[in-house]
Amino acid sequence: SAELSEVNLESINSLFNDLSSKPLITDMDVNIQELNVYGYKILNANIKYVPTNKNVSIQILSNDVVGNILWDSKENLLKAGFEKLHLKKNNTLVDDESKFIFSDAPKINIKAKSLMLDEDAYGDLSLIAFKENKMWNIESFKIISPDHTINGSGLWDDEGLSPNTSINFSWDIANIEKTFDQLSYPELIKDGKASVIGMLSWPKSPFDFDKSTLKGNFSLTATDGVVLEAKPGVARLFGLLTLQNLPRRLSLDFSDIFSKGFIFDKINAGVIVNNGILKSNRFSMVGPAAEVSIKGETNIIEETQNIHVIVNPRISDSLSLLSLAGGPLAGAAAFIAQKILKDPLNKIMSDEYQIIGTWDEPEEIQTPQIERFGEMISQEILQPSSEFLNIK
């Protein structure tokens, strides 16, 4: 066995070249203090290398990585299986030192039961990729956690003047609350399910993800959850959207409804991503208490936002239910009248405002509405009433 202080795995790729001839090394047992693997590092690793029958078997054992790599020269296939693959970014490497170099790039099939990059845990990973026309074709990748699953495919140009990664993905979330906890956004949403479908691209490799250079778009659908009370940071912004200030704005007492968050039946959104800025002209959140529509943008790098919010509380339906105290006929009449009048209470009591500033200290700007109340009353109540009662 041998002891080495620092090794780039890419620098010994000659071991894998021309495996039809006798390998340069018959076997190897090396302890490496720092093993650099495409921009990430493995500390205090034991590497065992054994070529057999024109194949190469490598065993890697460390506190952070446990697995085996098999090179099938006949099929030009690199298969890797890891019980644990916990990698830490090596920020001391320059780009040229982290090139994924092979003289004849193999097809890659990687499985890892526990993937972690830096401090971010991703779960179970499977990846199939091959190189074609100087570009890596990511045939498929899947990340499975107990509460969510990501499927995708994509392309990775690692040889051009401007390296780039682009992926198409679908993200199925069985439990939003637990998934957000895993992503370090605890106590933001309770329960809930979601589906996210989109396309994203960024410079450099799939492993060198930088949200400040992220571009693309995605659609979001979420159901049956609760946006919880305001917390510091991004959750503070969500807190504003839970309508906890709505009772003050409407001078009505809804504290029993909103004190513990906003229950939503469904959230729909289409989002454009451009260099870390998320923009949406169609974000809607519907719940038993209100309908919320949002458009604007938020900067996930600077943690700021400029969004326009319209809140339509579902007051008329609630009042219809309360009117049942006067008897079933009274309740039914109130409900039908409100629907014929196109929910005038909901529209008159709607709230409109702008949220700017930072996530930690958002600033709320109320939009004046008094001047439009007269017109709204005429359009939504007087005119429909006249038509319904056949008044001329």
What are these regions (language model features)?
Residues 45, 54-58, 141:
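N-terminal beta-strand/beta-hairpin edge segment
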Residues 2-15, 25-36, 61-121, 126-356, ...:
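Small-residue helix/turn framework positions
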Residues 390-392:
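Short, solvent-exposed mixed-charge patches
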Residues 360, 366, 379-380:
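C-terminal accessory extensions/subdomains outside the catalytic/core fold
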Residues 49-51, 131:
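Aromatic-rich beta-strand edge motifs centered on tyrosine
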Residues 36, 44-46:
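Extracellular beta-sheet-rich ligand-binding/adhesion modules
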